[in-house]
Curated annotation (Swiss-Prot):
One of its GO terms (molecular function) is endopeptidase activity. The gene is yyaK. This is Uncharacterized protein YyaK. InterPro entries: Rce1/LyrA-like_dom. Pfam families: Rce1-like. One of its GO terms (biological process) is CAAX-box protein maturation. It comes from Bacillus subtilis (strain 168).
Length: 299
């Protein structure tokens, strides 16, 4: 078992992991409370914006996109506090076992996954051109969207990576050394906790398969590469691409002013693309890790 799953530094007993988990949940709950107060304040100061009780979102999806990310401004400090003061080890240990983060690996994960997203979207456009339509372009709103995509979305994806493939993977690593079990447990939790997303309305079975695919594949190559650096980049690339370029009615991002809106047809086709992209990317990630490791050993 590599030193990322079983950190050498700190006090990593199970009871400490339990209390660390409680701290993270507590900060996450505080983030949600802050989000609710932000919604209330927005509705009071701007009567043109209302809160949709049925959808549990603001009437302006772009404003809601900004406010919802308040949650993750609490979540990441929650991970930091738990790791630093309960597990008694440096924060970087939920990212990498090395002495410092490797930004080249993060950048590689981002660029490789972003390019795969472009390729798959182009293929889908060629096959289903009628599903795509360009939204009416509003420069001011798109600039605000771009700022959110570049700054806030990576915070959200990093929070999820730190918690699931950082903290939880290491916590369950105290119980089992079997990489397959770890992949199923942590990847399964990641997928299942995304089942509340609006995409499930497009076809619950196939959307569920998509989320589980993300969970299983990303967790697997995190175990194999011994850090969350590549998945940090890949997760950010996936969400940033969707935020900037593609939106649909039944999605987490809803009616934000992305460049294109998509009307989904066959959910099975979407699941196929998701599986294909992630398997290809996993192969690329493992190849890159092996190549980098060989280069380090040869130097």
């Amino acid at each position: 078992m590599n030193s990322f799953i079983r950190p050498i530094e700190g006090n990593n007993t199970l009871w400490r992991y339990f209390f660390a988990f409680l701290v993270m949940v507590g900060l996450y709950v505080l983030g949600n409370i802050a989000y609710l107060f932000a919604i209330l304040f927005t509705v009071i100061v701007n009567p043109n914006i209302t809160f949709d009780l049925d959808e549990a979102v603001l009437s302006d999806p772009l404003v809601d996109l900004y406010l919802s990310h308040v949650i993750y401004l609490f979540a990441i400090p929650g991970v930091w506090l738990a790791v630093r003061f309960i597990l008694k080890r440096p924060f970087r240990t939920v990212i990498t076992p090395n002495s410092k983060m490797n930004w080249r690996r993060i950048s590689f994960g981002f660029i490789a996954y972003f390019l795969l997203m472009i390729a798959v979207q182009l293929i889908d456009f060629v096959i289903h051109p009628d599903s795509y339509s360009m939204q009416e372009f509003n420069a001011s709103r798109f600039i605000w969207l771009l700022a959110a995509a570049l700054i806030l979305v990576p915070i959200q994806t990093s929070a999820e990576e730190l918690f699931f493939r950082g903290f939880l993977l290491q916590a369950f690593g105290r119980l089992t050394k079997n990489p397959l079990f770890l992949t199923l447990i942590v990847g399964g939790l990641f997928g299942v906790l995304h089942f509340a997303n609006p995409e499930m309305n497009n076809g619950a079975v196939w959307a569920g398969i998509e989320y589980l695919t993300f969970g299983f594949v990303w967790t697997y190559y995190t175990i194999k590469t011994g850090s969350i650096e590549i998945s940090l980049g890949a997760h950010a690339a996936n969400n940033m691409f969707l935020c900037m370029f593609i939106t649909e009615k039944n999605s987490v991002y809803g009616g934000i002013p992305s460049l294109f809106t998509v009307t989904r047809g066959n959910p099975m086709w979407e699941a196929f693309f998701t599986i294909a992209v992630n398997l290809v990317f996993a192969g690329i990630a493992l190849w890159y890790h092996k190549k980098s490791k060989s280069k380090q050993q040869g130097s």
